[in-house]
From Swiss-Prot:
Organism lineage: Eukaryota, Metazoa, Chordata, Craniata, Vertebrata
Residue ranges annotated as Extracellular topological domain: 34-240
Pfam families per UniProt: Ig_3, V-set
Protein name as catalogued: Hepatic and glial cell adhesion molecule
Source organism of this protein record: Bos taurus (Bovine)
Every Ig-like C2-type domain range: 148-234
Matches recorded under InterPro entries: HEPACAM_domain (IPR052280), Ig-like_dom (IPR007110), Ig-like_dom_sf (IPR036179), Ig-like_fold (IPR013783), Ig_sub (IPR003599), Ig_sub2 (IPR003598), Ig_V-set (IPR013106)
Any one annotated GO CC term: cell-cell junction
Disulfides per UniProt: 168-217
Length: 418
């Protein structure tokens, strides 16, 4: 009974192992496919230049391979697809005129751009082959580093200062890495030496005399390297002499500022005096200008007096006070004896005592010059500003005129008694 039961179970186990045996037989047969190799897995490219993504494949088939290059992104980008070296389809605009394929499947990408950086995958298949070969190559694209420089606020520093900063600067370059050198050797680790996260800035805290040296920086990226010229940092020791000189300089500076502050008000007062002097001069000039019309008017009146002396005499006579009575102008007394054979008529009542008595019989008068005209022409013109002299001259003219009239009256005709 036991033997009969074991026979069916063995047959069932053999049936279960049959597929695995078949698979083992298949694996032991030689496989036909494409084998791809590449001399490099990483290529560094420069912007504007070309990069060769080199591969080689091997196959038992003599047919042309189907080659496909892709740039791996979140969504793969097909760069080119071809049969042999003949491109299939249309290239993307950003790859047009920049792609070239070789018979071994290699890709030449010219005029590199920063956007070309990434991982490229190639697939090569042959229709007769069962399997397709694949290979990936990484491409980096960078800008060369320009010559760097070390920037410092000052090349001199005082010992035990708070901090001193050095900055490594350069204009061009991508993916830079910085290294600091002291006297041409890499900077040793020191608690006083602090580097920024990108190591571009070096800060020395609590400067010591041993920090007096040459400093430089090295900048590099995958395709280039640059080294800055060394910068000499001079550290001065603190001393009593330096402190004294510093104190003296501060004192002189404060004194200079004080003197300048005191000098400014004096300049303002000087300007004020000058302004007052100018105002006074302008006032005097204005006063002279006001007096000039009056001075010009007075001489004109003198000229008018010269042209019309009689009018001047009449005006002056009216304006001048009454002249004093001259005893010489009084008439001769009636009791005064006349010449023999003549009788004098008595004075007419009501006449002014100053007027001469005229006789009934008249004789022709002797010609006489006009006293006013002669006197007026002989008198000089009145000067401006001398009224007293003009009045005395008018009085003299009036007195002279009265005398002449009296003389003419006295010399006039008298009655002859029969």
């Amino acid at each position: 009974m036991k033997r009969e039961r074991e026979a069916p179970s063995r047959a069932f186990s053999a049936l279960r192992l049959a597929p695995f045996v078949y698979l083992l037989l298949i694996q032991t047969e030689p496989l036909e496919g494409v084998n791809i190799t590449s001399p490099v897995r990483l290529i560094h490219g420069t912007v504007g230049k070309a990069a060769l993504l080199s591969v080689q494949y091997s196959s038992t088939s003599s047919d042309k391979p189907v080659v496909k290059w892709q740039l791996k992104r979140d969504k793969p980008v097909t760069v080119v697809q071809s049969i042999g070296t003949e491109v299939i389809g249309t290239l993307r605009p950003d790859y047009r005129d920049r792609i070239r394929l070789f018979e071994n499947g290699s890709l030449l990408l010219s005029d590199l751009q920063l956007a070309d950086e990434g991982t490229y995958e190639v697939e090569i298949s042959i229709t007769d082959d069962t399997f397709t070969g694949e290979k990936t190559i990484n491409l980096t694209v960078d800008v060369p580093i320009s010559r760097p420089q070390v920037l410092v606020a000052s090349t001199t520093v005082l010992e035990l200062s708070e901090a001193f900063t050095l900055n490594c600067s350069h204009e061009n370059g991508t993916k830079p890495s910085y290294t600091w050198l002291k006297d041409g050797k890499p900077l040793l680790n020191d608690s006083r030496m602090l580097l920024s996260p990108d190591q571009k800035v070096l800060t020395i805290t609590r400067v010591l005399m041993e920090d007096d040296d040459l400093y430089s920086c090295v900048v590099e990226n995958p395709i280039s390297q640059g080294r800055s010229p060394p910068v000499k940092i001079t550290v001065y020791r603190r001393s009593s002499l330096y402190i004294i000189l510093s104190t003296g300089g501060i004192f002189l500076l404060v004194t200079l500022v004080t003197v300048c502050a005191c000098w400014k008000p004096s300049k303002k007062s000087g300007k004020k005096r000058k302004l007052e002097k100018q105002n006074s001069m302008e006032y005097m000039d204005q006063s002279d200008d006001r007096l000039k019309p009056e001075a010009d008017t007075l001489p004109r009146s003198g000229e008018q007096e010269r042209k019309n002396p009689m009018a001047l005499y009449i005006l002056k006579d009216k304006d001048s006070p009454e002249p004093e009575e001259n005893p010489a102008s009084e008439p001769r007394s009636a009791a005064e004896p006349g010449p023999p054979g003549y009788s004098v008529s008595p004075a007419v009542p009501g006449r002014s005592p100053g007027l001469p008595i005229r006789s009934a019989r008249r004789y022709p008068r002797s010609p006489a010059r006009s006293p006013a005209t002669g006197r007026t022409h002989s008198s000089p013109p009145r000067a401006p500003g001398s009224p007293g002299r003009s009045r005395s001259a008018s009085r003299t003219l009036r007195t002279a005129g009265v005398h002449l009239i009296r003389e003419q009256d006295e010399a006039g005709p008298v009655e002859i008694s029969a």
